[in-house]
């Protein structure tokens, strides 16, 4: 399987980074400056739309199943 790494050097301010279809996430370091209300609310948040009843989730599930099927054929 080919790997296409994504390197993120910095995320600052009121930023959100969404990473879809990640097999593993290996940060070199994680830090946050706490300022203002809610500043102590830190941590990694993992969300999944696999159980959602919306059409976008159904499309995501179809892509996931297609990837799983492709991987099983490649590794067989």
From Swiss-Prot:
Instruction: Report which superkingdom the organism of origin falls in.
Output: Bacteria
Q: Which InterPro entries match?
A: Spore_germination_GerPA
Q: What Pfam families does UniProt report for this protein, alphabetically?
A: gerPA
Q: Which cysteines are joined by disulfide bonds?
A: none
- What protein family is recorded? Belongs to the GerPA/GerPF family.
Protein name per Swiss-Prot or TrEMBL: Spore germination protein-like protein YdzR
Q: Name its species.
A: Bacillus subtilis (strain 168)
Q: Per UniProt, what is the name of the gene that codes for the protein in this document?
A: ydzR
